[in-house]
């Protein structure tokens, strides 16, 4: 459950380390895995393309909140993480760190799925 003011770890190599959500796209109060958010960069690597204070679009790939699946299984991650995307929905980075949830496949984020090392 990602709400406005929630800080997320950035799980790609764009140069941002941490972002803060301030808007959830669509008529939703909270964002789950696979939802697109608008966020502000709070911490970034020096000399990177993305600077502190930039407004970016991101897709949530991991949440601490338990994800209940149709088959009865539950999945929970250690952190809240997102991948920065452009307006078309393509990831801006070329690598995705850590596992991603399988729910991204249902939302048609195939490029992120292909870059991920592990899909759970």
Curated annotation (Swiss-Prot):
Q: Which SMART domains match?
A: Ribosomal_L14 (SM01374)
Single GO term (MF): structural constituent of ribosome
Kindly state which keywords UniProt assigns to this record, in alphabetical order: Ribonucleoprotein, Ribosomal protein, RNA-binding, rRNA-binding
Asked if the keyword Oxidoreductase belongs to this entry, the reply reads: no
What domain of life does the UniProt record list for this protein's source? Answer: Bacteria
Gene Ontology CC entries for this record: cytosolic large ribosomal subunit
Keyword rRNA processing attributed: no
Q: Which GO terms describe its biological process?
A: translation
What PANTHER family does this protein's entry cite?
50S/60S RIBOSOMAL PROTEIN L14/L23 (PTHR11761), LARGE RIBOSOMAL SUBUNIT PROTEIN UL14M (PTHR11761:SF3)
Subunit details:
Part of the 50S ribosomal subunit. Forms a cluster with proteins L3 and L19. In the 70S ribosome, L14 and L19 interact and together make contacts with the 16S rRNA in bridges B5 and B8.
As for family, the record states:
Belongs to the universal ribosomal protein uL14 family.
User: What does the UniProt record say this protein does?
Assistant: Binds to 23S rRNA. Forms part of two intersubunit bridges in the 70S ribosome.
Its recorded name reads: Large ribosomal subunit protein uL14
């Amino acid at each position: 459950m990602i709400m406005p003011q929630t800080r997320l770890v950035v799980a790609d190599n764009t140069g941002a380390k941490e972002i803060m959500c301030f808007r959830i796209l669509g008529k939703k109060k909270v964002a789950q895995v696979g939802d697109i958010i608008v966020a502000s960069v709070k911490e970034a690597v020096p000399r990177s393309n993305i600077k502190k204070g930039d407004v970016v679009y991101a897709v949530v790939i991991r949440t601490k909140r338990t994800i209940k699946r149709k088959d009865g299984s539950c999945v929970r991650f250690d952190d809240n993480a997102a991948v920065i995307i452009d307006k078309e929905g393509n990831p801006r980075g070329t690598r995705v760190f850590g596992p991603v949830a399988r729910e991204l496949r249902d939302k048609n984020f195939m490029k992120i799925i292909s870059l991920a090392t592990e899909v759970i």
